[in-house]
Amino acid sequence: SYGAVPFDLAAGTEQWWSIDSSDSAYWAVQENINAIRAAAGLSPLAMDGGLSAAADARCESFVAGGAFDHSGMTTRSEICAAGPIGSASSVCSYWQNSPAHYANITNASFTSMGVGCWFCSTAEGQYTYWTVTFN
């Protein structure tokens, strides 16, 4: 169940959708993150609704034209990605192969996580914002 949220972007009006806990991609991110942690000998992270709300809000701010950086972060830590990254496994693979993102994923002090994802399909292809928040 995707909720269509239209935004007037610089390139024109695009139709954006966000995922939530009813979507398999939401849980696939957690599964992939926890597999990366397990390979590093770490405990799995529990999904947290408040952290997911924060991750979703970060993605929404990117869609609305906010700076794509970590300023204004409201959680202990976050990882973000943007571009034509259409699947949970693809974005998690990207994060796993980035030393800074991998360091966040494998931070042993984290016990919970949240997931946000907003995407748009255009004539040029799919564009996606992903955020995972940690605590």
Q: What is each residue range found by the language model?
A:
Residues 1-135:
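Functional surface patches built around histidine and acidic residues
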